[in-house]
């Protein structure tokens, strides 16, 4: 009996000779064939979506059989949880960090106020899209109610980051940090802003070593000598976001790593000291660049600080590098973040095929600090400051987590 004609999953042509996808065979996915090796390779990235969907389906079936989905996933064999995701199995990594599988998405109680993207199937913020289309000016927050609402969000964000940093140690997984952030946010009647924002799958960004930003929490355990950035944003019951991040040295970090973290802190501190009415937003990048360069570091150009408040991201756009063309002059009532990402090597970055994790192109380490601030009549107010630290002051002990 001759082989029946089937369609190539790459080009769609009818084929008789069946080149089966080995991963589909492993997962039990039928009738997934290609006409030749070249077609298979050129279409593999898109084809992997089928693998991901099947893996999620299998996981859901396992969870239903166990009667408790989250517990079942957490109790899965360690080797299974730490396996490489499908997209990573043929990916050319730039450094030593590797991703693992992800835990199930955490749920948010119905009573928590949520931003518009929380329920959007693709995580789109329609309010941000309308803002970009219709508004080119920087919003000024004037009323006491608005300002108190933003201050509350920033205070809640600070408390959540403090809780997360207490849990950070050698051997803890970044997924556990995500659990702490998620639960601490809910306890404060806040929504963890990263969750489902353009489909980001977790409640906090955890960026380790060569990861510049947007690292996704997973089952990898934090290692002795890692530097780990925790980026927390919460959305409060008043409808405002508060955003901050800090980088920590975990265990025995070498001199270069500790100096990098301190340099990133100093870059932010120098920029914050310039905040006052009349300062050009573009000038922040100049002082950040000079500080980084003086310490033999570089400044990432792809990602910027941003306006924040009722929207997660809005005007102004604040590049951290010199000779940028940022528009705008600071005025009382402006609320925004500054968040320079500082690298030990070159400034170039690439994004993993998870579509989120930004890493250094040369695999060298990166560090970052971020605050949300309000421009006042005479200067600024650091809304996400540590307790009793209205002005940024370096204290290495604050950013060190021993074994």
Annotated model-derived regions:
Residues 9, 22, 33-40:
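Cys/His/Pro-rich metal-binding microdomains
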Residues 2-4, 12-20, 25-29, 44, ...:
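Active-site neighborhoods and metal-handling regions in enzymes and metal-associated proteins
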């Amino acid at each position: 009996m001759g082989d029946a004609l089937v369609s190539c999953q790459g080009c769609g042509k009818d084929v008789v000779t069946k080149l089966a996808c080995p991963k589909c065979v492993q997962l039990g996915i039928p009738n997934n064939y290609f006409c030749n090796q070249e077609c298979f390779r050129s279409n593999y990235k898109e084809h992997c979506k089928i693998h991901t969907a099947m893996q999620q389906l299998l996981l859901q079936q396992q969870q239903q059989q166990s009667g408790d989905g989250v517990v079942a996933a957490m109790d899965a064999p360690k080797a299974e949880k730490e396996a490489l995701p499908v997209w990573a199995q043929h990916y050319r990594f730039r450094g030593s960090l590797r991703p693992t599988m992800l835990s199930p998405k955490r749920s948010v109680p119905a009573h928590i106020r949520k931003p518009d993207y929380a329920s959007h199937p693709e995580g789109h913020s329609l309010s941000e899209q309308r803002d970009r289309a219709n508004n080119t000016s920087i919003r000024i927050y004037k009323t006491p109610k608005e300002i108190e609402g933003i201050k509350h969000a920033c205070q809640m964000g600070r408390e959540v980051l403090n809780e997360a940093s207490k849990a950070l140690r050698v051997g803890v997984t970044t997924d556990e940090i995500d659990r702490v952030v998620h639960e601490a946010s809910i306890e404060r009647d806040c929504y963890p802003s990263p969750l489902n924002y353009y489909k980001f799958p977790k409640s906090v960004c955890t960026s380790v070593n060569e990861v510049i930003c947007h690292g996704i929490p997973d089952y990898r355990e934090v290692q002795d000598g890692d530097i780990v950035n925790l980026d927390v944003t919460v959305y409060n019951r008043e409808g405002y976001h508060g955003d901050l991040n800090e980088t920590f040295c975990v265990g025995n970090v070498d001199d270069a790593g500790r100096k990098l973290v301190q340099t990133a802190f100093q870059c932010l501190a120098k920029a914050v000291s310039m905040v006052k009415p009349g300062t050009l937003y573009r000038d922040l990048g100049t002082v950040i660049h000079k500080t980084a360069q003086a310490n033999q570091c570089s400044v990432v150009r792809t990602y910027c600080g941003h306006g924040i408040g009722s929207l997660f991201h809005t005007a102004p756009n604040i590049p951290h590098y010199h000779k940028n063309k940022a528009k705008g002059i600071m005025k009382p009532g402006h609320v925004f973040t500054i968040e320079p990402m500082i690298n030990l090597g070159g400034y170039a970055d690439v994004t993993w095929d998870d579509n989120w994790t930004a890493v250094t192109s040369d695999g060298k380490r990166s560090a970052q600090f971020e605050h949300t601030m309000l421009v006042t009549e005479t200067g600024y107010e650091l809304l996400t400051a540590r307790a009793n630290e209205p002005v940024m002051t370096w204290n290495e002990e604050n950013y060190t987590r021993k074994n």
